[in-house]
Amino acid sequence: MKNIKSQILLASLLVASLSCIAAPRLVYFGDTLQWNTDWVKKQCGTLDIKANIIEVSGIACSRVTPGYIWMQSDETAKYIIATDEKGEKRACKVNMSKTIRWDWEDMSGGVYEGKNYLFIGAFGDNDETDGEYSVVWFEEPAIDPENAPEITVTPNRIKYVYPDGKKHNNEALMYDNRDQVIYIITKVYYNVCQVFSLPFRTDYGDEEQTLTYVCDLGVKSDLGEGTKPYKGFHLVTAADISPDGKYILIKNHNNIVATYCWVLLFTREEGESVAETLIRQTHPEPIKAYNTYEWQGEAICWLDSATFYTTSDADDGNPPIYKYTKKVNAAVETVQTKKADDKTLVMIDNVMYIRSKQGLFTLDGRKVQ
């Protein structure tokens, strides 16, 4: 009994010590980036993998049925599921009428010609030997847990190749609502990851498309010359663009310990393409997105431009679901649009809030200040 208690104590001390370790600094284009401290992280739920899905590698907030999060696994290309942010119960299972490649690695949602679509990156290729890459897409279905807990859709796909003619491993995909462009990011160990783009259309058919090279995420010298720890940004596992197109998140996991995750936040200027933002902003703001229990963090998505979620690729434990909320600074309130019943609608950083005597709330009633 003493031995068991000693082991438990040792494990607890180890966890505590890991959680107290300062995150290593991130070097990007030769400079050490400064942490962005404008985001508050909290665990909003725990994903019950037996009731939902294992090894989540991509998530996307539902736009058709707000309040739910779509999730897909890199273990199956047969279905996706939807759950709420608590992750306790599956609200919907969407089966694919046909299987399109097995290694799904990321997903995103977006609007095209007035319709909401879901995009899935069927492009994982760890050994860079496959060479068959595609983006799976279909119109986002409504979520109705009571009347339609399980439905079937017919997926489409866009087959593509890289402009260099080589094979690449990928784990990150994002869709830009402003310009209707899909962005794909390679996952590279101990080297610089690359960004590619493809305009979305629904009429590509079966013809292979060639991606356009956009940029590198950093330079090789950021990583050091064969030394550990590697301080540069590599091993990209997820990405997403806010619905209004203003913010870009790119997530990785570090090689020091897989629990360390960096999230780069890029801010897009008006009239700028995503490609122009990534090329211009060589000093993005890294958000502290590491946690002792966020093992293999491979999924990220925006709810709105002030809130995003992350979760992890786990098959032997229920991973936490984290919610990041941007801190609100009353000094940046720019518009007061309506006042009724002692409540005022205010616009802060392009996001609408309700201010009352009790504090500041999101439109769905969540208190943020």
Range-by-range predicted roles:
Residues 328-357, 367-368:
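Residue-level detector of functionally pivotal "anchor" positions at catalytic/ligand-binding pockets or at interdomain
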Residues 1-32, 369:
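Bacterial Sec-dependent N-terminal signal peptides
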Residues 90, 368-369:
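Surface-exposed loop/edge segments in extracytoplasmic proteins
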